[in-house]
C-alpha cells in the first residue's frame, strides 16, 4: 500500500452532556440543577434508556443514506449518542446498563444507521474489557484516563487487530506490528511502534487505538504479544483511506499505519509469550460483543421489513385497484420475513437474559452465542434477499433503502467468529461425543 498524507480529526469534547431538570415546586426562582444525561438514564431505568435510543436513532437516520453513498464518517451521530447519555451505556460509572438493555439500544440505533452502531458497539465492548480487566493487566492510571475521557465526552475506543498479511488474529499467528524498546528524549524507557492495521472500524473518530502487536524477537524478555495503547493524535499515526466496501460504508474501517510512534512504557498491556493461550479478556467478553453485533443486524432486518411493509401498502397498481399488501403472495412473503425476525429476537434476548442472570445460567449459555450468531446473521440475509426478490427493480434502486439494508447485512458474516469456524467446531464436538 502507498501511504497517503496523514489526516487528522477534531479531538473529543471535554463537555459532558447535561440536561436541565425543572420541577413543579415553587422554587422561588432557584436555578434547577444540571444533571448529566447518563445519570438521568441510570435513574430512569430501561424505559428511559430505550426512549433516548429511539430519539437518537431518528437523528442517525437523517444522514444514513448520505454517509453510505459517500463512505464518510458521521461525527454528528457519535455526538448525538453522547448527548443522549448513551456513550457510556455499560460503564458502571456511566449508565450501568445490563446486556439486554444494551442490545436493545444497539438494535434501535442500528435501525437509524448500522455503521454508526458498529462503531458504537466496538467502543462499548472494548470499554468493558478495560473495566472488567479479568486478567488484571491494565495499569490503573491508564485505565482511569480512558474511562474519564469517555465520561467527559465522545472519546471512542477500538481494538486494531487485523493485518494485511496475517489476516484476523482469531485464526492464530504473530502480528507483524512491532513495539521495540527505546529511550525517550527525557531518558525514560518508551516503546516505538511500527506497523499497519486494516479494517480499523471508526478510524477517524477514534480517540484510543488498542493495537495488537508483538515485541521484537531480540527483546530482553523474549518476544511477547499484547496490546499497545495509542492515543489517536500521537505523532506518527496515519489513517489511509482504503475502506470502499459494499456495506457498512460509513464505518470508515480504513487502514491505520504507525510510523515510529513513541509510547510511554506503561502503554504496553497484557504482553505474553506467543502461544500462551487466548486472551482472557477476549474470552470473557465474547458473549457481550457477539450479542451486540447480532443486535445490529437484528435491527437491519427490521428496517428492511418496515420499509417493505410501507412500500407494499402504498403501491397500488392500476390493474389491481388495491395495494400489493392485499395479495396473499405478498402477505405470505412478509410473514416469512417476520418469522425470521421473531426467531432472531427470541434467540438474541433469551441469550442476553441468561447472561444477565449470571452464575451457572450464564456459564451454560455462553458457548451457544457462536451458534446463535450463525443462525441470526443467515436469517437476516435470507429475509432481505426475500424482500428484494419480492419487489424486483424498486428494491435494487438507490432511491430506496432496501438495497442499503441488504448490503449492510452481508457484512454480518465477516465478524468473528465466522460461520466456517463455528460450524466446524460444532460438528467436531458432536462427532467426538
Could you tell me what each predicted segment is?
Residues 65-68, 342-375, 385-396:
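C-terminal helix-coil-helix/basic helical segment that borders enzyme active sites and/or dimer interfaces
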Residues 245-340:
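Glycine-rich beta->alpha junctions and the first turn(s) of the following alpha-helix
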